[in-house]
C-alpha cells in the first residue's frame, strides 16, 4: 500500500493499494448513487450529504463500526467479529472535530461513524480525557477538504 495523502494535524490518511485491487473477503460500504465508472475519490465524496436537511443535530443517533481493543474483543470462537456501538451527537462540528457519546476503547481510531441512514459523518480519532463515553471524530467537512488537496 502507499499513502497518497496525509496531514500532520489530522489523524487521517488516504491510502491506495499498489495493485489497485481490493483484497478478497473485504466488505465495501455501499455508496449513495454507486457508479463503477467513477473514480474512488468521486465515490467517497458521495458519502457526504450537502443538503441542510441532512445536517447533524444535537442528540442525533450515530453508530460506529470497528474493532474496539483490536483482537482482544474481536477474536471469537467463530473468528474475528466487528463491533457496532452507538451514541449521540453531543457537540456539533467546528470544522475540525465532532463530539459524540459513542463508547470506544483503544483501537477504535479510524472507525467509520455513520448516521441512521448509513451515511458516513466522521472518522473516529480521539477520546476526551480518561472517559470512554465522549469521543471525537474527524467530521465530513474536514474529510472532504482533505480529499481535495
Where are these regions (language model features)?
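Small beta-barrel nucleic-acid-binding modules, principally OB-folds
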Residues: 99-100, 148
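A short, hydrophobic, proline-anchored segment that marks a local hinge/packing element in signaling
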Residues: 110-112
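Short conserved active-site loop signatures built around small residues
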Residues: 118
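Flexible, gly/ser-rich surface segments that form the specificity/activation loops bordering the active-site cleft
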Residues: 42-98, 104-108, 124-136
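C-terminal cap/linker of serine protease catalytic domains
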Residues: 1, 22-41, 68-71, 80, ...
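Conserved active-site neighborhood of the chymotrypsin/trypsin-like protease fold
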Residues: 1, 5-58, 65, 70-73, ...
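Short, acidic, Ser/Thr-enriched surface-loop or helix-capping motifs
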Residues: 115
Amino acid at each position: 500500500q502507499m499513502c497518497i495523502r496525509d496531514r500532520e494535524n489530522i489523524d487521517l490518511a488516504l491510502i491506495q493499494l499498489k495493485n489497485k485491487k481490493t483484497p478478497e473477503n473485504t466488505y465495501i460500504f455501499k455508496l449513495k448513487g454507486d457508479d463503477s465508472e467513477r473514480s474512488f475519490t468521486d465515490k467517497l465524496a458521495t458519502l457526504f450529504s450537502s443538503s441542510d436537511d441532512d445536517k447533524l443535530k444535537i442528540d442525533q443517533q450515530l453508530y460506529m463500526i470497528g474493532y474496539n481493543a483490536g483482537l482482544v474483543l474481536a477474536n471469537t470462537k467463530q473468528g474475528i467479529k466487528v463491533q457496532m456501538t452507538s451514541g449521540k451527537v453531543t457537540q456539533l462540528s467546528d470544522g475540525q472535530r465532532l463530539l459524540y457519546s459513542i463508547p470506544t476503547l483503544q483501537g477504535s481510531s479510524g472507525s467509520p461513524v455513520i448516521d441512521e441512514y448509513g451515511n458516513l459523518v466522521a472518522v473516529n480519532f480521539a477520546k476526551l480525557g480518561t472517559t470512554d463515553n465522549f469521543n471525537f471524530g474527524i467530521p465530513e467537512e474536514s474529510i472532504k477538504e482533505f480529499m481535495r488537496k
